[in-house]
Amino acid sequence: MMMPELPEDLLVEILCRVPATSLKRLRSTCKLWNHLYNDKRFKSKHCHKAPRQSLILMWKNFGFSSISINLQRVSPIEVTGELNLIDHHSSLGMFRNSPLCQTSGLLLCVNVEKINTRLVVWNPCTGKTKWIQHRRMGYICNYALGSYQDKKSDNNSYKILSHGIYGGQEFEIYEINSNSWRILDVTVDSSLYIENVSLKGKTYWFATDGNDKPCDLFLICFDYTTERFERLCLPYQIPYFRNTSLSVVKEEKLSVLLQPSLTSKTQIWVTNKIGEAKVLSWIKFLTVDLKPEIKYGIKFLVDEENKVLVYEQNFVINGKNNMIYVVGEDNEVREVVFRVGLKPLFFYYVPSLTQIRQGND
């Protein structure tokens, strides 16, 4: 007995609640499902109603992989999938792993070939890309990707923020909707760190006031709607930190790792859900005793459910390099066997059907 066909409006209501990764596998089931997968209105509905499934992505050996880390026991990292950037202009093999920024299921990668800088905004779930030429040749920049609510379409739209790394604080904005760069009329007196993360329409950096005297570290965020910077306080203030790092918790919260100088005691703090309150508040997640030989460059993830910190270190330490560590409330540090390439960079990624506007779309 054949199953009756569902009305299209009912099918839409069902499929818009299916996670993006599962929907990607289902698109080959029939022409209608494949059509919905590419339909702009369906994608917009899906972004609002579909459950968020967080993956761990790793950049390694000039490519991306999805990975699984067993938090309960010591076991090798499992590579669960490979993600390929397909475009006739270039290949991911020519991309450097830093800077790398992501928001709303989109990744921003930067390719520098001699004096030519090219950027690509990429949705790994849909495979769609948008290639962008930076108008300044031979100018070394830091980049960030963020979103804002477009008043005309009432949909999320995207901008890229760039600023010089070595000298100068001139900021430029690239609007994906208009395919154009423009200089941003803002002045920032602080010195921004290179590392940044984007969350809920804003990008965050560590920053200092940039004078020669000991000065407190703080956060600066850039709002892509107002195109203005805002200064934010960290959980506590001291003149010197040995280690600092930023991370995003499943596209909902901001997390910071703070290790004061002359100690291995490290605190991990997590904010309230970004966007749900006007005031940013901090909750101490863990205090752990990281190895004192850990140097600058630590990257980390927070697993709130299992109450553990996962961090990696790319420097050679006691003959070891590229190690991943898992540490929990018991302060027991476990080394995870790492066999997936050199100089990894890993982060939480939430797949989505987010569209990338192309030219006259």
From Swiss-Prot:
- Which PANTHER family does this one have? BNACNNG10540D PROTEIN, F-BOX PROTEIN CPR30-LIKE
Source species, domain of life: Eukaryota
Q: Specify one Pfam family.
A: FBA_1
What is the phylogenetic placement of the source species in the record? Eukaryota, Viridiplantae, Streptophyta, Embryophyta, Tracheophyta
**By its UniProt entry, which InterPro entries does this protein fall under?**
F-box-assoc_dom_typ1, F-box-assoc_interact_dom, F-box-like_dom_sf, F-box_dom, Gal_Oxase/kelch_b-propeller, SCF_F-box_component
Q: Which NCBIfam families match?
A: F_box_assoc_1
Question: Which Gene3D superfamilies does the entry link to?
Answer: 1.20.1280.50
The F-box domain, residue ranges: 1-45
| Native source organism of the sequence | Arabidopsis thaliana
Protein name as catalogued:
Putative F-box protein At3g25460
